[in-house]
A protein has these predicted regions:
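A short, glycine/small-residue-rich beta-strand->loop->alpha-helix junction that serves as a flexible
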Residues: 5-19
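Short aromatic-enriched loop/helix-cap "lid" or pocket-rim segments at secondary-structure transitions
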Residues: 17, 44-48, 66-71, 115-116, ...
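Short, solvent-exposed loop/turn segments at secondary-structure junctions
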Residues: 10-12, 39-41, 107-110, 129-132
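Extreme N-terminal starter segment of soluble prokaryotic enzymes
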Residues: 1-3
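Active-site proximal beta-strand in glycosyltransferases
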Residues: 101-103, 117-154
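N-terminal strand-loop element at the rim of the active site
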Residues: 8-11, 24-76
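An amphipathic, basic-hydrophobic alpha-helix
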Residues: 65-111
Length: 156
């Protein structure tokens, strides 16, 4: 199979898992091409070493926005718009090629990558750990209603 892989991961366990998965697919003689925005960490276990083709797509960032982003520990809305624009471009590149499937990993900033909105090929979105904020929101909501989020049993 001809497989396109997309990720915007930081270094860590998810990146290690992806690295080993790509290595495994290559051992099975699949063609694996990797597409990443410049915000992805490729210093830790670089996929360039284990894939057929590797492409980095630049995400526009000015030095001022980079400093502000570092101070705030997160990207601004403008940074996210630039990231979305880059991921849309990557999706278009993949859509124009003859891939059988696209394997998509999480995004380090928005969890579900913007690329998912634009990809037209059959795809697999691997989401090993969903963002847990929704659980906290539910617990707060239940507290305000005077209910506990835990199941209760009635004694008879």
């Amino acid at each position: 199979m001809k497989i396109a892989v997309f990720h915007n991961l930081p270094s860590g366990g998810a990146k290690r898992s992806l690295y080993n998965f790509v290595k495994y697919l290559m051992r099975l003689n699949h063609t694996v091409d990797v597409f990443v925005p410049s915000t992805a960490d490729e210093y830790f276990l670089p996929l360039k070493e284990v894939s057929n083709k590797f492409q980095v797509f630049w995400v526009e960032r000015t030095i001022t926005r980079l400093i502000k982003s570092t101070i705030r520990y997160g990207p601004s809305l403008r940074d996210l718009a630039d990231l979305e624009r880059t991921q849309r471009y990557i999706a278009n590149v993949i859509n124009r090629a003859d891939y059988d499937v696209v394997y998509i990993e999480q995004d380090r900033y928005v969890m579900s990558p913007f690329l998912l909105k634009y990809i037209k090929k059959p795809s697999i979105y691997y989401c090993p750990q969903p963002l847990r904020t929704s659980e906290a929101i539910l617990q707060n909501f239940l507290k305000k209603l005077g209910r506990s989020g835990e199941k209760t049993s009635s004694a008879s």
